[in-house]
């Protein structure tokens, strides 16, 4: 409570002003998930992985697979760190279960 001086004037002692401070937030860093070409993984399996784990249409998955085949690497998508890390693990796990040497990595965008 504010204290009052004689004469009814408020000298401001004991009063406070509450201001709302909005926290400064940053957007999370994004990471590209990459599939690497190899000579052993069937092209159809790469298309399956892109459809299954990255929700790509058959057409987009085929286009990305051909890019990987011709250029050695291709971007599957861009995600936050945790999502990218999970997708990399899912792809590698699926490749191992199907006995393919397919490699998947992530890098900061």
Curated annotation (Swiss-Prot):
Chain positions covered by the region annotation Disordered: 1-21
Disulfide feature: none
Subunit structure: Binds to the N-terminal domain of the chaperone ClpA.
Record GO biological process: protein catabolic process; proteolysis
Protein task: Involved in the modulation of the specificity of the ClpAP-mediated ATP-dependent protein degradation.
SUPFAM superfamilies recorded: ClpS-like
Homology family: Belongs to the ClpS family.
A UniProt-annotated Pfam family: ClpS
Organism domain of life: Bacteria
Listed name of the protein: ATP-dependent Clp protease adapter protein ClpS
